[in-house]
Design a protein with these regions (language model features):
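Outer-membrane beta-barrel biogenesis signature
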Residues: 24-81, 174, 351-356
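Extracellular loop and loop/strand-boundary signature of outer-membrane beta-barrel proteins
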Residues: 42, 87-91, 132-138, 185-190, ...
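Residues on the lipid-exposed face of transmembrane beta-strands in outer-membrane beta-barrel proteins
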Residues: 43, 57-59, 103-107, 117, ...
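Residues that define the transmembrane beta-barrel architecture of outer-membrane proteins
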Residues: 51, 97-101, 140-146, 160, ...
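Repeated loop/turn-to-beta-strand initiation elements of outer-membrane beta-barrel proteins
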Residues: 53, 113-115, 148, 157-162, ...
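Transmembrane beta-strands of outer-membrane beta-barrel pores
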Residues: 59-65, 119-125, 154, 168-174, ...
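Outer membrane beta-barrel transmembrane domains
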Residues: 68-70, 74-83, 230-356
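Long, hydrophobic/aromatic-enriched structural stretches that serve as scaffold segments
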Residues: 86-149, 153
Length: 356
């Protein structure tokens, strides 16, 4: 693809998995999940020409909450003491707001091989009112897990591209954060996942009408290994596809994007004994003292979203884009539900050594 075409066909798709949850103000933490908006930016997925560095600066805002009166069945996951406590509480409000600022650098080693480094900085705000304690807001911020991806362009033509990627998540994000009570916050509230992860992906794009309509699709899979606390985040599958449309031929600087994003997430699991919380007494009853690998109830989800957006070429200096992700179907298994999310970003291409 030419440099000029790169500006016109910046696809808006990204997989920013930022799993964050809420803090529990007493001696246990509820395992509530909140996920981030996932729109993919085509300039992240493509392989730049040799010597070109494509830089994306992205801001992502994703609110999540439980429907009114729900969320009381979310269990308490205490990974530090290897305890999983089932719950049945009266819940009036549980919410999380996740903000992620991402620096993504995509470099063309050759015209077919690329190297991508993704650095997320996350801020998590959360609060829960479960009717058994005074709600205490929780806030944390810092670096998330760094992702490094090697990519190969299987089909480099003027109108199409098929890119195979293999990414590795490095456990650079904080995983030992503690609440104001001194207790370690549960795994899903930490900024990082605490262990390495693998992320194979396949990206495809084709110009249906040159310089006017561009089709794109992406499939990716994430597997994170069990961390030292015995907690393992569930596998994740993402499927996305859509069109980039230039509505006016004389206005090549203005692009509309329309896409559908589907995500399936497996239940998390942890090494733990099993308890049942009794809200009448405020104590937990031991059900099974054996510490074994157990699925965490109410984790895992299925989600389908429609994501419209725009991209503007800023005087051939950079590209700016904005996307709104609107839920179409969601099954969050009794946990927090992702609401309308927003993504804003800018793309800039630099010529480094080795290019022509």
């Amino acid at each position: 693809m030419t440099h000029k075409l790169r500006w016109r066909s910046v696809q808006l798709l990204c997989v920013l998995a930022a799993i964050t949850l809420m803090a529990w103000p007493s001696s246990v933490s509820a395992s509530c999940g909140a996920v981030s908006c996932f729109v993919v930016i085509g300039s992240q997925q493509q392989v730049p020409m040799a010597g070109l560095l494509t830089v994306n600066a992205i801001y992502n805002y994703t609110p999540s909450w439980t429907p009114a009166g729900q969320g009381g069945g979310i269990p308490f996951a205490d990974q530090e003491n290897r305890q999983l406590t089932l719950a049945n509480l009266n819940s009036s409000q549980i919410w999380t707001h996740v903000q992620t600022a991402t620096l993504d650098m995509n470099y063309g080693l050759t015209d077919r091989f690329g190297l991508q480094v993704t650095l997320p900085y996350k801020r998590v705000n959360s609060e829960a009112n479960l009717g058994v304690a005074t709600p205490v807001p929780y806030t944390d911020q810092g670096m998330g897990d760094m992702r490094v991806t090697m990519k190969y362009n299987l089909l480099p033509t003027l109108r199409s591209m098929v890119v195979l990627g293999v990414g590795v998540d490095f456990p650079t994000g904080t995983y030992q954060a503690r609440a104001s009570t001194g207790q370690m916050v549960e795994s899903t509230l930490q900024l990082g996942r605490g262990n390495f992860g693998l992320l194979p992906s396949l990206y495809q794009t084709y110009e249906i009408i040159p310089h006017r309509i561009n089709q794109f699709a992406l499939v990716s899979y994430r597997h994170t290994f069990k961390n030292n606390d015995g907690y393992q985040f569930g596998d994740e599958v993402n499927l996305s596809g859509g069109l980039n449309i230039i509505p006016l031929e004389q206005s090549q600087w203005f692009v509309l994007t329309q896409q559908l994003n589907y995500r399936w997430m497996q239940n998390d699991a942890m090494d733990a004994s099993l308890y049942q919380f009794n809200p009448a007494t405020g104590t937990s009853v031991l059900l099974d003292p054996t510490v074994k690998f157990r699925a965490v109830p109410t984790t895992g989800s299925t989600y389908l979203a429609y994501s419209p957006g725009i991209m503007l070429n800023l005087w051939n200096f950079a590209s700016a884009y904005a996307v709104v992700q609107i839920p179409v179907y969601r099954d969050f298994n009794g946990n927090l539900e992702q609401q309308v999310s927003y993504l804003f970003g800018m793309t800039k291409v630099f010529q480094l050594l080795g290019g022509s």
